From Swiss-Prot:
One of its GO terms (molecular function) is polygalacturonase activity. Keywords: Cell wall biogenesis/degradation, Disulfide bond, Glycoprotein, Glycosidase, Hydrolase, Repeat, Secreted, Signal, Zymogen. Residues 1-21 form the signal peptide. This is Polygalacturonase. Glycans are attached at residues 276, 340. The gene is PGN1. It comes from the Eukaryota. Residues 22-27 form a propeptide. GO terms for cellular component: extracellular region.
């Protein structure tokens, strides 16, 4: 009787299993090797694999509007055809999205085909690399990227995004005319964390133009313009608040710590912390904070429309070259305040004789 009951139970369970759906809809897992098919079918897939894809010239690998909770995996080598255009080469948007790199993958943007020493200031029209726009509670991790034509990640209109273990290697551009190859440009976004990035480029490692609650931690930045707030001003959104940069090394770069606001503009920069920062072989400025910035070059005359308040520097140490300047602060009258610096030690370069309106709590 017991055996019969047990057999009946097992048969019933088997019938239930057989009758149940497989749990994986045919469209849940999608591997794409061409861009057109990926773009057409993306919205019906929960797990998207971009495998060994060559994206045609002038085409964005458009992964916007994905299913909530979708995962995108880059596998093998992803490449892009050559055309002069604005880009982007890749675009992703959605809620609870995960973008990851499979072991051994590479995303090769072939920037050398566009590099001409002019970046986005002229010459060839160069595509931006990756638009991370309109993302909510999402993550991008473990991507290996090389040779972006100009700026790499544009992060805009985002709420809650973690970028972890991103490698961008544009070092070939040091001698081949790469310019304006910012790694991470952030605007109008909140709750952003960039961690464990390894960046070799020719412009800002991180540039925060507007946004709040932004963390940059345990990153390696080499060859570029440092970790920057700004330039702030002259846009629709001109407020930066609540930024922490920590545990980061900036080497072989023009600048280390940089905060720059646009001459004559309005906005605000507040609650900024740089802590446990190591500088190595900085060519121009170890620490530079200026309220006179223009793309054509600083004016030397600070303006007060974008006050810089609550700047904490703690344990920022390292070296600049003999021709570089250790610290340079140029503030308008009364427009820099509430600064607190401790453990700041920059050596090897020149002392600036042009600092102006340095607030108490800081030194120049």
């Amino acid at each position: 009787m017991v055996a019969y009951a047990l057999t009946s139970m097992l048969l019933s369970a088997g019938a239930l299993v057989a009758a149940a759906p497989s749990g994986l809809d045919a469209r849940d897992g999608c591997t794409f090797t061409d861009a057109a098919t990926a773009i057409k079918n993306k919205a019906s897939c929960s797990n998207i694999v971009i495998s060994g894809m060559t994206v045609p010239a002038g085409t964005t690998l458009d992964l916007t509007g994905l299913k909530s909770g979708a995962t995108v995996t880059f596998q093998g080598t992803t490449t892009f055809g050559y055309k002069e255009w604005e880009g982007p080469l890749i675009s992703v948007s959605g809620t609870n999205i995960k973008v990851v790199g499979a072991s051994g993958h590479t995303i090769d943007a072939a920037g050398q085909k566009w590099w001409d020493g002019k970046g986005s200031n002229g010459g060839k029209t160069k595509p931006k690399f990756f638009y991370a726009h309109s993302l909510t509670t999402s993550s991008i991790s473990g991507l290996n990227i090389k040779n972006t034509p100009v700026q790499a990640f544009s992060i805009n209109g985002v709420t809650g995004l973690t970028l972890d273990r991103i490698t961008i290697d544009n070092s070939a551009g040091d001698s081949a005319g790469a310019h304006n190859t910012d790694a991470f440009d952030i605007g109008s976004s909140s709750g952003i964390t960039i961690s464990n990035a390894n960046i070799k480029n020719q412009d800002d490692c991180v540039a925060i133009n507007s946004g709040s609650d932004i963390h940059v931690t345990n990153c390696q930045c080499s060859g570029g313009h440092g970790v920057s707030i700004g330039s702030v001003g002259g846009r629709k959104d001109n407020t930066v608040k609540g930024v922490v940069v920590s545990g980061t090394t900036i080497a072989n770069s023009d600048n280390g710590v940089r905060i720059k606001t646009i001459s004559g503009a309005t906005g605000s920069v507040s609650d900024i912390t740089y802590e446990n920062i190591t500088l190595k072989n900085i060519a121009k400025y170890g620490i530079v904070i200026e309220q006179d910035y223009l793309n054509g070059g600083p004016t030397g005359k600070p303006t007060t429309g974008v006050p810089i308040t609550g700047v904490t520097l703690k344990n920022v140490a390292g070296s600049v070259t003999g021709s570089g300047t250790e610290i340079y602060v140029l503030c308008g009258k009364g427009s820099c305040s509430g600064w607190n610096w401790s453990g700041v030690s920059i050596t090897g370069g020149k002392k600036s004789s042009s600092c102006l309106n340095v607030p108490s709590g800081a030194s120049c």
